C-alpha cells in the first residue's frame, strides 16, 4: 500500500501534505496526554508495525500486500490519534531510509495507513466489542480498517487520469478493485488474525488496558 513517487501528481501530493499537517499536530498533542505507563508498549507496537510492513504477502494476481498494525495500536492505546503518529513515524523512516513509499507521497501514505486505517478499524472495534467481545471485534476492525485504507488508495490512483494525466494511468474501474482484492484476500485476513491474537494475549496479561475511561473514573470515585 506504500505509494511510490511518480504515481500521484504534485497537486495530489501537496493536498495530502496539507491535510496531514493539522492531523500530525493533533496527534502529537494526543500523544503527550498518553498515560506514561503505556509508552513502552507503544514503542513495542510501533516497532512491530515497522516489522510487519516489511513483509509482503503474495497475491494471486501477481502483486503483494502487507499488514500495517494501525488498528492494533489504536485499540491497545485506546486512541486512534496515537496510532496516527506512530504509523506516520514508521512510514517516514521507511520512505527516507528504505525507499519503501515515495518521499512525495508521504502525506498520502500517512493519510491512508495512519488515518483511515486506524480510525476505521478502531471505531468498528468500539461498535462491535460489547456485542462480540474485544478479541473478535479487534480482528474485524483490523480487517475492515486495512481494506478501507486500500480502497481509499485505489481512489487516489483512479483520480489521477482525470486531474493530473501522466501519473497513475489506471481509472477507478481498475485501481479500486485491484487494491481492494489484494487486501480482501491476503493482508486483511492476516491483519485480522494477528490483531486478534495479540489482543487476546494482551487481554490476559494486561486486562487494565481494556478498562474503559468511564470504568476507571467510577472506580476512583468509589
Swiss-Prot record:
Keywords for the protein's UniProt record, in alphabetical order: Cell membrane, Membrane, Transmembrane, Transmembrane helix, Transport
Broad class of the protein's primary localization: membrane
Localization terms from the record: Cell membrane
Domain of life from the UniProt record: Archaea
A Gene Ontology BP annotation from the UniProt entry: transition metal ion transport
Stretch forming the signal peptide: none
Record keyword Transmembrane present: yes
Membrane-topology annotation of the record: Multi-pass membrane protein
Family listed: Belongs to the CbiM family.
Role this protein plays: May be involved in metal transport.
The protein's name: Putative metal transport protein MJ1569
Organism: Methanocaldococcus jannaschii (strain ATCC 43067 / DSM 2661 / JAL-1 / JCM 10045 / NBRC 100440) (Methanococcus jannaschii)
